[in-house]
């Protein structure tokens, strides 16, 4: 069975000793008893099973001590309430059971106290803050000494324990309920412990402030001794009253586990001394082996009880012969035994067998006599096993008075409300009453009163609870003294129990202690100090093994073994402690004995016990003394009833005192708070500077501070006012907006109403007009049918709308008064008008007229039919049969008309076919004629074009030497170049292309189609195609190839991911916003341009020169402004300046550009033209050491490691004549003309050209033509000077893409192909020669060599078979090298028998052989043109070549 047991505080008595620090096993040693559980668990885990007997005996010792005291008190209670009851023993046993359970709770309360049980080092730190030690080593709370102790008895309902009372019901539903309750309690405990830890982590943690007021510390200590040896070591602990209302949260373990801990106190040999820190120890849970042992013990108990019953029946026969006095004594003694048996039954978890030492004080020692168990004992045992009643919650009302055990003397004062054995170590005296306790600490008194106990029914928490008033009984001083005498006489100093059960309470209601002393008769000896020896104790134990242990043992161990262990353990004990224990037990048991005898006279159910062999009866002096004692006990019972009434009054007084104490405590708290506030104010005053001022005037600082505070307040108020004003303005604005909206809504509503009214009026007017029109019109069947048709049409239109309730369509029915309804109405109106006129003439009243008119109108006017007859089928119409008859008559006439019309149509169609055929024939004839004429024209044009092409080819062959094909293909075909350059060829090519297209389109004979005229042809074609496919290897391969399945399913293919990262809703607005934020000044723009030219497109480097710009800003600015600032052109110019310093010395671009149409090679108009007999002379000048540069982006040479001369382009014009005398002219005149032309070009075309005035540093080469050929009608030569390949302005950008130098030269020179000068002259002047020599150059070697055609390449390939170099070829090569430098293609053109690759290999091979490096350096000093020479005889060969040219 599972019984919920409340935790109870254990009051503690004082025993002063001197051996506080000794680690001995004496009863005089004082230490903390509540830590026995923790210390035993820490030190005795290894010796747990070896010392079971000693530990179990030690545990039961404490429990039995407590039980004895409770039994004595509860006997008195039962006697007072059940005097005439025959079943006293049954109630007595029930109460004893409850009391014993309460005693167990008392033991557990000390173990579950907050300061001693709660695990963890946090508890120790918390106690170290507020605890101190006495001179004896006792720990107590120095802060809470003066706090009310009533909280010890508060909220006991929340602290419950569970004990496995009967383990035979392990499979019952109650066991399951127990497990559920344990789980709930564990969860609650974990939550509370978590909250408690969080509470302790706070920085403002303080007991005195954060916690509720706690009562003063009851420095009462519990005793745990070894019952077998009597030499146990004493452990004293303080019962800390702090946080009593939540004890479950202060312990780490569940209640069931805590109960096991309390019941499993280990051997005292392994106990530790008092620790001021009170470190709690952890106890492991009980193992299942112990549970099995308990079950075995219970079975043995039942067997023993059966044996005891048999023995009792035998004893009853013997006891009937004895006297009534012996029977009463025996009855009293038997009741004590029953109490002790109940104690043992309730302490099943203790597993001990040593209750005999406490309870068998007056038992007989003979082996023949056996103690018996009464039926009442059996009933109590059965009730305990089968009861489902929880133990009542009895709260200790007070602690006990002090007992002194010094100099081997014992003084005992009995009490009624004590519950446990207690010891107190300390200096503070305690004054205790029946129902209240007063602890005097530091000259202050605080009184604690108990709370009402409750009796709870059921097994769970949620069941009903019934309050039960406590039954308090008190025994008089006389009964106490008589009990002392009787127990001392019964024991005779031979008591077997070495245990102690001290319980002292003063009966007086006052706060002072009243020691009770009763007059005893001279015949009754009072034993106060009886010396006992260890040998006597051992003998008694050995003699009583068989009798005592058979009644009371509940353990698995044998009785003899247990008692032998007790004897062995008693060897270490002291005689003084044994004497003390035995005396005290005798007195308590006597008290119980006497109380039960007085009120069990009428009980006939209890069999007597034979006490013939009892050693305690030897000291009784006659039956008279005993009868006197019984009388005294009856008197005491009467006095006790009176005392109960007094106690009730005292309780009321105590309650009032408690209320007063609470009020006082609250006042003290308020005083403390006030005192703290005063201290804080004093500290602030000390910290602030103090000045000596007059009391009436404030200090300057105070005034200034006050002024500042006022100003701050004013500023705050002003800010508040402004904020309020702003809010008010906003509210007003909102109100105005809402008003405007309301006005607009009202206007809108009014307008809608007005419109509705107007529409209603219009509808009415339209209806009236329709009625008038309908009345005026004469209706016919056609008009009625048309109106119905229109109405139905309008209704059918409305059917397309979503929400429309279609009306039924009207049907035409001439019989249903659809016709001439209006005429009838008009006739009725006319008649009414006539009647009115007649009535007026007769002078009748208007009212009567109106009434009559209305009646007539209602009677005469027939209303229009709202809904006509609806016909569902065609046959329902009346006109259906009429129409059939009429159509039968018309049918013959209609057939005749249709035949006539058909014949006429056939005739008309025949005429149209004839006309169409005749027109087609005429059209074909005309078309043939047109084609013949057109073909003739085309043939004539083709012949002309062919002639022109032949002429051009001949001219090209004459002008250009044969060339070998180069590796690079032409950029544009000959057709494109001819279209761009030739004067008349473009038109001819275009006409040829159009004529060919017309031939394809117009000639019918040349057109072929794939159309099959029949199925047979189609099948033949398909068969041929299949044969071809069968022979085709690709088709065979494709047939054998497997079709690759799609990698993705169609569903996955349709899946598209739309990425919205960086999505811009309105890019235009964002760009405007960005531009508005970023503003570039002109200085910044100029700075950017400079840095960009230094570090092109290195935006991070450029951004480092700006303070408030990033690389992103640089990039954005560049791409937005690169065209407006012309950054590419500027960058190219800057790079060309660097490259120009190391450029090629010789520039071979000396050519004449002419064109009839005045366009350059890109089709752009030229800006410079000349008259007849004038040409442009383009010369390239090189200057050494000059600073002038060209602005051409195309012809600028590439940069190199070294700086070289800079190239210049000079355009000179001169009038040319056909006379040979004018062919030669001086170089000075050319220089002058160059200067003039440069100035003109700078003004017109914005070209940056420089004038070269130094003859020493400049050399010019000019090509002149004596006669210019004439192509076309005009004789003018148009010269293009705006070509980007020749001269480029600073602002102009080339329109063509970037090309290589060779491609540019080819594109530029194709414009002058049609020119074929007969005798061009080459004049060269050097700075070293003083006289100018004029020598005729070869026949246009330069211009002819610039054009490359496909035909020349084919000829060169044939002539390139000869790889040997003749002397003539070498001479030509030397001349070409002097002119063209390292441009091997031009050299090959000049030599005409070698390719560019052959010239390149010949040049480097000869250079390697002759090591011409030195010769090139010497030649550079003599001439400004840097070109290599092959041998020293180059000048002679050059003169010979000139002579050959002249001869040609």
UniProtKB/Swiss-Prot annotation:
Q: Which Gene3D superfamilies match?
A: Homeodomain-like
Q: Which domain of life is it from?
A: Eukaryota
Indicate where this protein is primarily found: nucleus
Q: Where is the composition biased (Basic and acidic residues)?
A: 42-57, 120-132, 828-847, 1439-1448
GO terms in the biological process aspect are: regulation of transcription by RNA polymerase II
Polar residues: bias regions: 189-207, 271-280, 361-372, 513-532, 606-620, 971-983
Q: Sorted alphabetically, which SMART domains does this protein's record hold?
A: SANT
Compartmental location? Nucleus
The answer to whether UniProt assigns keyword Nucleus to this entry is yes
- What keywords tag this UniProt record? Nucleus, Repeat
Q: Tell me what this protein is called.
A: Myb-like protein P
